[in-house]
């Protein structure tokens, strides 16, 4: 079975922009060695929203950044499916952010490893074996 790593939105942004010091050093090797590196479609929305609100500096049009930061960068885009959305709704409400709940549900649906520095993710017992 191939290993998939799903990047939380901030990890994806840092990875693409070469800000490797922002996450644990061993993750870079795990990400590079994974058979599939992916992001949830909701991460595109989070990037565009953060950029639109001035919380994220991107020096090219955000649409170009998103396009360049997916397939050309070796990152697979995972869709939001009915199963993922229902699973996100049914998660215990530890994390109030619906975007993060959708990322958690995506990880669980795909059985993938999750790269995130969000401390709330570790409070989900069902994520225990999926966190990097």
Question: Language model features by range: what are they?
Answer:
Residues 8-9, 43, 117:
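A secondary-structure boundary/capping signal
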Residues 8-9, 47, 88, 107:
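Generic structural signal for small/hydrophobic residues in well-ordered secondary structure
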Residues 2-4, 104-132:
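Acidic, PIN/NYN-like endoribonuclease modules and their adjacent C-terminal/linker elements
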Residues 66-93:
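Acidic catalytic patch
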Residues 12, 44, 85, 121-122:
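A generic structural signal for short hydrophobic patches within well-formed alpha-helices
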Residues 1-39, 53-68, 110, 124:
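Short, well-structured N-terminal submotif of metal-dependent ribonuclease cores
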């Amino acid at each position: 079975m191939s290993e998939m790593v799903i990047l939380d939105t901030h990890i994806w942004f840092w990875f693409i922009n070469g800000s490797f010091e922002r996450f644990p050093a061993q993750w870079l090797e795990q990400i590079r060695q994974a058979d599939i590196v992916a992001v949830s479609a909701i991460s595109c929305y989070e990037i565009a929203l953060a950029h639109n609100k001035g919380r994220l500096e991107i020096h090219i049009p955000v649409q170009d950044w998103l396009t360049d930061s997916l397939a050309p960068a070796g990152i697979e885009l995972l869709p939001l499916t009915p199963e993922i959305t229902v699973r996100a709704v049914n998660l215990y409400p530890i994390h109030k952010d619906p975007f993060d709940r959708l990322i958690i549900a995506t990880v669980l649906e795909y059985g993938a490893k999750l790269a995130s520095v969000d401390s709330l993710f570790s409070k989900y017992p069902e994520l225990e074996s999926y966190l990097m």
